[in-house]
Structures are given as structure tokens and as C-alpha cells.
Amino acid sequence: MPIKVPNDLPAATVLENENMFVMRENRAASQDIRPLDLLILNLMPTKVETEIQIMRLLSNSPLQVNVRLLQMSSHVSKNTSQEYLDRFYDRFDDVKSRKWDGMIITGAPVENIDFEEVDYWDELCQIMEWSKKNVFSTLHICWGAQAGLNYHYGIPKYPLESKMSGVFAHKAIVRDDPLLRGCDDIFWFPHSRHTEVRAEDIIRNPHLHIIAVSDEAGVGIVVSENSGQVFVTGHMEYDAKTLSYEYYRDLGKGMNPHIPYHYFPDDDPSKDPVMNWRSTANLIFTNWLNYYVYQRVPYDINEIGKDSE
């Protein structure tokens, strides 16, 4: 089944050229089915690239998904024009009056800043609080996961001695969780961050469950007891060359970054990386949509959140 996007969204053309099933709004309007309504709160500076990466994964599901993109009113983007954002992105005031089946909160390159010092932190907290009664399940990515764990559960983040950059092996510790259905015993996905959350803090909270860990990267995936909150500490949505782009970007800034671990063949940046996390990313995004959202959400979307009132 397709993902529905605005008629003239540039990402749609890219996805169609990759043979992804994308449905334009005017075609979807003629269908009489119950699609899933999804928000993507895109905090990444590379807006278009992140749109493509996430929508590519969502479009691989057998479910029709209506996607709305969300921007922060309290932040001025340095990398994406306001004209583009105003054309394709909603603000919180535009979406808060209704219910949503799911929401994705992306990462953001602000790990080295205290949460409270991030210029849009207050607005993000408002959105996360609102989501508890108005969004059925929220998937948090990288810094978005750290932010969500901190806001909802008081879990702190800790600075790393050096950037965690590379593709790391993970293993399931809750093998029967639906989110991991179909995953290999050992599965890989990228991390790109300067801070971490620690297992000992999460284990102490009875409302949270760590379902996947990495010997090198630490906590991999955390879910809440009711599946309403999902936290992925890495970037399984990344393209094959995203870590390469970040590595050369940091080199250009004179930052002397470490070569991403387990990424370039023979640790040689002149060689093209092999993408070994594509199937994992597709499985977990599809499982989230199917098992955490579609199979559990009320058919009447207005019933979302009523059991928490």
C-alpha cells in the first residue's frame, strides 16, 4: 500500500523514481478506506534528505499512510528556506486540534547542548505532552529518543568521550516483541551521536523495556509498557552514504573525526560503504506501523487518548 503525500512535494518524485509506492493527494481522495494519519516532526537540518529517508521506509508498508510534516515555530532553520517550510510543513497550532495514529520525532544535531538550552525545547515539550493523549504511538529517533526519554521518564543523557559514529551490531533481548518480528538474531544499524542514555537508568523505570542492545553502542531500542512510546537511539533511516557525508563534513570543519566504525570496507574512506541495515530498517518501521499502530489503534481516530483521561 502507498504513502500519501502532497501533490507537489519534491520528495515524492525522488521516491517514485526509486519505484516506491507513493500516492498523490488527488488520487488518495477517491479511496474509501481508513488510512493511518502520521506526523513527522522533522528536526534534522537536512530536511529534504530526512523526508526521503523516512518516507522511503514508510512507503514499504502494506498500509496507506497520510503524512503531514511538522516544523517548530520557535526555531529558524539555517539550512532550509522558510518558503519551503511554509509550503510543505505545518506548525503545531495547525495539527493539535485533532488525533493522530502515529508520530515520528527525528534526531537533531544538538546533543552537546543541555535540553533546556535548545531554543525549541519548550515547544517540543508541549508537543510531547500533547502527544500522550492525541497520538497513539510515537517513534523517537536518536536525539529525539534522548529528548523523549528525558521528558517522559526523566532519563538523563551523558556525554561520550568521542562521537559514536558507525554501523553497530545489535541483539534482541526481548525476542518476542512485535517490533523485532522478522529481525535476524544479530542486526545492524547506524549511530551518529555525541551523547548516550544508559541501561541502568532505564532498567530502574518499570514503565520502560530495553528490547535491543549493542555491545559497542549500548542501548539500541526502548519501548514503553503500552507501546505508546518507542525510542531508537540510532539512525536506521540513514542512507548508505549519510555517515560518509557526515565524516567528510566534519573533516572539512577541522574536527579530526574518527572513521565511522564497521562502515567503510577495510576502514578505507575511499571505498563505497556497504549498506547492511536496509532490511532491518524496513522491518522495524513496518512492524511499528503494523503491530504498534494499525493493529491496536481504534478505528474511530477520535477515540485515541480516551483511556488516559
UniProtKB/Swiss-Prot annotation:
GO molecular function, one term: homoserine O-succinyltransferase activity
HAMAP family: MetA_acyltransf (MF_00295)
Annotated catalytic residues: 142 (acyl-thioester intermediate), 235 (proton acceptor), 237
UniProt cross-references to InterPro entries, sorted A to Z: Class_I_gatase-like, HST_MetA, MetA_family
Function, in words: Transfers an acetyl group from acetyl-CoA to L-homoserine, forming acetyl-L-homoserine.
Recorded GO CC terms: cytoplasm
Residues binding substrate: 163, 192, 249
PANTHER family: HOMOSERINE O-SUCCINYLTRANSFERASE
Broad class of enzyme this protein falls into: transferase
The protein's annotated pathway: Amino-acid biosynthesis; L-methionine biosynthesis via de novo pathway; O-acetyl-L-homoserine from L-homoserine: step 1/1
Catalytic activity, as annotated: L-homoserine + acetyl-CoA = O-acetyl-L-homoserine + CoA
Family assignment from sequence similarity: Belongs to the MetA family.
Lineage: Archaea, Methanobacteriati, Thermoplasmatota, Thermoplasmata, Methanomassiliicoccales
Any single biological process term in GO: methionine biosynthetic process
NCBIfam families: metA
Enzyme Commission designation: 2.3.1.31
Site annotation Important for substrate specificity: residues: 192
Name the record gives this protein: Homoserine O-acetyltransferase
Organism encoding this protein: Methanomethylophilus alvi (strain Mx1201)
Residue numbers marked as site, Important for acyl-CoA specificity: 111
